[in-house]
């Protein structure tokens, strides 16, 4: 959830480059801060548009509750899907913002599938259902409940949560079903 912060968008893109990642998955709420959030640092949606459009071929995004058709008109990559599905080893990961599909209203997951969403701005990892796992990277711009500004990476079956200095503060492999926090 960037929420229009050019400052944190730049920091996230720096982390993306530092990690040497192939793709950046954004979980919605790209340009607007919404009526329930204070303005994030360096609120500059036009600059965020420019920064993201420059790397459109490496982005994958889903729609957040603050994203609209107007946002899609200025962005050069699709953002309006409610969810997407990615393979993670022998499982499927449902990627969504969290306002439509979440633990209380699941997408069409099967036993063993993963649910990744933002929206709450609180990092999390926990098992549910039949060998399913819920993941949340937290937020780079407006973290909540005392959490750090940060991002999450995936390599193989290992998920890492890092702060914006690139320092890992949590990791979990799909084989590990220990809840956190």
Name each region found by the language model.
Residues 61, 94-95:
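Short catalytic-loop micro-motif centered on adjacent basic/acidic residues
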Residues 35-38, 71-75, 81, 106, ...:
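Short, well-ordered secondary-structure micro-motifs
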Residues 4-88:
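Core catalytic region of metal-dependent phosphoesterases/phosphodiesterases
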